[in-house]
């Protein structure tokens, strides 16, 4: 979908989500997004 946004921003989020889901929870809470869909924050 958004390959550019995915390569630049979501890549670090996906990596953190795969390695440390709790880190993503904190990051997503700041952006008011659910940690279940870390890639949606970039698409939306």
Curated annotation (Swiss-Prot):
Signal peptide: none annotated. It is found in: Secreted. Residues 1-32, 42-44 form a propeptide. Induction: By nitrogen starvation. It is further induced by a pheromone signal. Its transcription is limited to M cells. Keywords: Lipoprotein, Methylation, Pheromone, Prenylation, Secreted, Stress response. It comes from the Eukaryota. Its main location: secreted. A lipid is attached at residue 41 (S-farnesyl cysteine). The modification Cysteine methyl ester is found at residue 41. One of its GO terms (cellular component) is extracellular region. GO terms for biological process: cell-cell signaling; positive regulation of pheromone response MAPK cascade; signal transduction involved in positive regulation of conjugation with cellular fusion. One of its GO terms (molecular function) is mating pheromone activity. It comes from Schizosaccharomyces pombe (strain 972 / ATCC 24843) (Fission yeast). Coiled coil: none annotated. M-factor is a mating pheromone produced by M-type mating cells. All three mfm genes contribute to the production of M-factor. This is M-factor.
